[in-house]
Amino acid sequence: MLQGRNLIDPMDFSVEELEEVFSLADKIIENPKKYSKVCEGKLLATLFYEPSTRTRLSFEAAMLRLGGKVLGFSDANCSSVSKGESLEDTIKIVSGYTDVIAIRHPKEGAAEVASKHSYVPIINAGDGGHQHPTQTLTDLLTIRRIKGDFSNHTIGLCGDLKFGRTVHSLVKALSRYENNKFILISPKELKIPDYIKEFLNERNIEFKEVDKLEDVIGELDILYMTRVQKERFEDKEEYIRLKDTYVLDKEKMNVAKEDMMVLHPLPRVNEISTNVDDDKRACYFKQARFGMFVRMALIAKVLGVE
């Protein structure tokens, strides 16, 4: 039963509960009209303290397509935050007006703090470089619809694995399924955090760290590309030096498996060449579309209105 639940970390939902969300998302994809009024009279707040295109708009589109309404902000400077209002007070006020809150915040742990002060379910739409569980639901739904299941895959995660919250969440989620192996591809400056490696070691899950995509791309069933995130760097010269470390292009795709799938949480900068977009293995635009449907399912589940 997911009604009234928060989603702060991808591990907050059991495998069975995740399957409930994916099953409903599949039904919505097949017959969206059936669900077009289930959230009538309900309000979603989108509190975005950081910039967003896909996540914010897909949350808002999800609620509107369910028949609900949306309020919120996409620039904290246009709210009372600019006057010094605390996160805790903002949440107490907004949760009194609405039925569910999606929050993105630059500070790690902000969504957890919000959940302790809210009268309504909190959905973490990204907290700093920590977690991004609804992107993980999007990634998993895409894998499920294209690969059929979540087990027995070699998954390559490439790019900014240090600050890439989507990577951290996806590794944790896929570690719950059988016989998955991770290849972590990054420069030494952007290696995945130790706590994720400890998480994998504690569960005896196989992984290796490498710094060259071309050396391992032929092994992969799933390649998850990420951009190097300019906004996480204090040293802009280091960002410039690292930003084009990995570029997936046709030449590299020629070495990959015929059924490998390429995912990317978007936005991309230079890390996937546009000449890959027409490759049947490029799944990132489908992935973005599925994000709206999985958020529709999640909202319906936590509101108990399906």
UniProtKB/Swiss-Prot annotation:
SUPFAM superfamilies: Aspartate/ornithine carbamoyltransferase. Carbamoyl phosphate binds at R54, T55, R104, H132, Q135, L266, P267. It holds the Pfam family OTCace_N. Its EC number is 2.1.3.2. Keywords: Pyrimidine biosynthesis, Transferase. It comes from the Bacteria. The keyword Lyase does not apply. Pathway: Pyrimidine metabolism; UMP biosynthesis via de novo pathway; (S)-dihydroorotate from bicarbonate: step 2/3. InterPro entries: Asp/Orn_carbamoyltranf_P-bd, Asp/Orn_carbamoylTrfase, Asp/Orn_carbamoylTrfase_sf, Asp_carbamoyltransf, Asp_carbamoyltransf_Asp/Orn-bd. PROSITE patterns: CARBAMOYLTRANSFERASE (PS00097). L-aspartate binds at K83, R165, R227. It catalyses: carbamoyl phosphate + L-aspartate = N-carbamoyl-L-aspartate + phosphate + H(+). One of its GO terms (biological process) is amino acid metabolic process. It is an enzyme of class 2 (transferase). GO terms for molecular function: amino acid binding; aspartate carbamoyltransferase activity. Heterododecamer (2C3:3R2) of six catalytic PyrB chains organized as two trimers (C3), and six regulatory PyrI chains organized as three dimers (R2). PANTHER family: ASPARTATE CARBAMOYLTRANSFERASE, ORNITHINE CARBAMOYLTRANSFERASE, MITOCHONDRIAL. Catalyzes the condensation of carbamoyl phosphate and aspartate to form carbamoyl aspartate and inorganic phosphate, the committed step in the de novo pyrimidine nucleotide biosynthesis pathway. Belongs to the aspartate/ornithine carbamoyltransferase superfamily. ATCase family. This is Aspartate carbamoyltransferase catalytic subunit. The lineage of its organism: Bacteria, Bacillati, Bacillota, Clostridia, Eubacteriales.
